[in-house]
Amino acid sequence: MNSLQEKFNKKNTKILIIVFICLFILDIFLWFGILKENEKLEMDFLDVGQGDATLIKFPFSGEILIDSGDGQQIKTALSSVKNYFNRHIDVWILSHANLDHYGGFLKLIETNPPQIFIYNGFDSEGTTFLLLKKLLKEKNIPLVTLYQGDKIKIGDSYFSILWPPKNKEIKDLNDSSLILRLVDKKHSALFLGDASTKISDNLINQQSEILKMSHHGSKTATSEEIIRLIKPSIALIGVGLNNSFHHPHDEVINLLKKFDVKIFRTDLNGTIKIIFDDKILIKEKK
């Protein structure tokens, strides 16, 4: 009897030791993963099909999601770049109220709501956008409206809001897009939403290495003047494979090639990770 009890106790002790070791190793991996992803500013230009979504992770200062696609692929896209045990995103920014930019927020709000929601103050008459605002209000999430001249400071980095001006009447939702310039030490990125070429005058002295192309590479949203003003070395295009709009348009691709701009598009490259190091580092997920 004693012999059986000793064997049983030894077996249980071994199991407990193994469980303890596994938990200890898991704990190390979790903490290593959380700390590692906060060392430098990282920007994930997410593959969400025919839409835009960019996750920005600031060093020790939280995360911001700019746009979220139409909702069909946002959870899958985020799961490929975020720690499984940390799904929270601090701030959501909506460039403008088109479904292919805000639809994903509806998929995330029930399980992972933000602390703040930032947008341009221009509402869509669509019922889905009204639903998003209703859910934000129900969860007591502040809706903050930003305009030209405003700034968002996060640690050593900041966003400048270049468009739209306050109290300006804009009929086209695309042209109401929040235009944001992210600056981190010696690197910068410009986000144009879906704004058309009409806004080019507002981009003087806004040179940026990285350009999030407007309106998925549409020829109505890019001109030679804009490329000359911004002088990008990298262009990001959020676009669905074989989309019915034929984005990006050949004219835009040829223009970028003319200026030796490196082109990354989600339909061909998948999610694109950009790390703001001494130099810009780029990793493709596909």
Describe the function of each predicted region.
Residues 2-286:
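Non-globular, low-confidence helical/coil segments that flank catalytic cores
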